[in-house]
Amino acid sequence: MTITNINQLDPINGLYTYAEYLLWKFEERVELLKGKLFKMSAPSPAHQVVQSNLNIELGLYIRNQKCQIYPAPFDVRLPAKGEIGDAIHTVVQPDLCVVCDRTKIDSRGCIGAPDLVIEIISPGNSKKELKQKFKLYEEAGVREYWVIHPSEEYVIVNVLENNHYKTLSPIVDDEVHSVIFPTLKVHTKEIFRN
């Protein structure tokens, strides 16, 4: 059944799959975290500036790699063990993601872990959502996960080591160095340039 209004869904008790997600025809952007519905808040102007700056900086670097950068909205399906196709319960839309394995890309987005995920914090992001995404990306095998805080102008880099994230010290007014792309360096001044 096609859903045309988000109020037709049960955000508290509902457990949804990608097959159901594909039938939703309402304006609000949402994500599914292990089947649970999370409404995405509209990005702030600072969020949009950071996303645009990163798209430029990373785009210049990535175009010389065998990878591709994808900005939101772009569905990333993260199947849990045993989940396949439209039965997947986790669909996220990272602000930016980099995928080097082109076989993960299909006509609907990415299936499986991107190599790099970047989330830009907006006032509407809940701590619960951030904690769940950290765990989801870790479990899915996202090799590097950046969390960017525009209001305080710092970046946190999480690197997957032995299936667990190692969180590096917050980066303020300095270069952000990627571990998985050793020659990628972006200064926070370029990230937060307005």
Stretches with model-predicted labels:
Residues M1-N194:
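Gly/Pro/Ser/Thr-rich low-complexity, intrinsically disordered segments predominantly at protein N-termini
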